[in-house]
Amino acid sequence: MSTGLDMSLDDMIAKNRKSRGGAGPARGTGSGSGPGPTRRNNPNRKSTRSAPYQSAKAPESTWGHDMFSDRSEDHRSGRSSAGIETGTKLYISNLDYGVMNEDIKELFAEVGELKRYTVHFDRSGRSKGTAEVVYSRRGDALAAVKKYNDVQLDGKPMKIEIVGTNLQTAAAPSGRPANGNSNGAPWRGGQGRGGQQRGGGRGGGGRGGGGRGRRPGKGPAEKISAEDLDADLDKYHSGDMETN
């Protein structure tokens, strides 16, 4: 019997196959005691499991700050910003607890158009004895104050106030007339800060007063001759020429 050293490589391979009982199953076939379940990976199969959330998609356009653009658009279109109420509001107090919203509406709608009206209630639903109405026009609000203030409603006089700064108070009359002074004489245009009229008459003290005469001294006024006036006039002109 030939030993393994004398055998060729092909003979050794054939011998090993015979000793194992023939050619075994090919690798990967997995033939065992029974065909087990095989999982098929179908690429077209869709998972029925729903995701807990959906991923946000990026916006197609570039984001831009639009806060100021919205405000400018509202300003151009005349729309008021949120939270800012237009109109004139009246605050009504000293109301009977039985006065309801419909009573306020019926009473104050007789004067003008109402934008809003409400009676104030506490948490238990009991009236606080106060209410407020908002008129579209300020003139209607003023008319309502004149008509209903201190007027009794269900036996109690209403106290009505205008809320906010929409009402322009009339200016207090001044002691000085608009077209004159306190004595009734009309004011002249171009008065100085000291209350004197600009450009006093001739002979008024000094150059500042517009006159050409000498300033009055403490003693009695001396008489000025024509020669003195001419001399002073020459000095005046010569002084102006030196200055220029």
Curated annotation (Swiss-Prot):
The modification N-acetylserine is found at S2. SUPFAM superfamilies: RNA-binding domain, RBD. GO terms for biological process: mRNA transport. Keywords: Acetylation, mRNA transport, Nucleus, RNA-binding, Transport. Export adapter involved in nuclear export of spliced and unspliced mRNA. Residues 67-77, 220-244 have a biased composition (Basic and acidic residues). It is found in: Nucleus, Nucleoplasm; Nucleus, Nucleolus. This is THO complex subunit 4A. It comes from Arabidopsis thaliana. CDD domains: RRM_THOC4 (cd12680). The keyword Transport applies. InterPro entries: ALYREF_mRNA_export (IPR051229), FoP_C (IPR025715), Nucleotide-bd_a/b_plait_sf (IPR012677), RBD_domain_sf (IPR035979), RRM_dom (IPR000504). Residues 1-82, 169-244 are annotated as: Disordered. Residues 21-35, 187-211 have a biased composition (Gly residues). Belongs to the ALYREF family.
